[in-house]
């Protein structure tokens, strides 16, 4: 039997995940690199010259041109959260590495949060994943392995 490339594609192990995103500082650095890959750009005026300062334990960026202040989580699903970024990143990892759906109850147990919190985290993460992929169109040959299709069975009477 031929080896299925999809089943054996390299993923990110839990040990690899913890090494890459296991601390608050590493999660913060990953967000900065993702949001501003070429360096800070003011969302208000587009200027790149800025200063940084810490207020209430959070790093802020201030535009030198218009004095607009922002944080790395402003305007994201993390904006109003009291949870550490490490929990959000772990939730993202668990949701993206599972072959099947990860239940909110399972997230609750893995993350050590309430059911309501786990459910809201999952909802927000799935919403942004859907938004990002909604404009993407698959091209060429598309192979689907272990598809789970649902819905009510149509009666042929």
Which residues make up each language-model segment?
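Residue-level recognition of single "structural anchor" positions
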Residues: 1-157
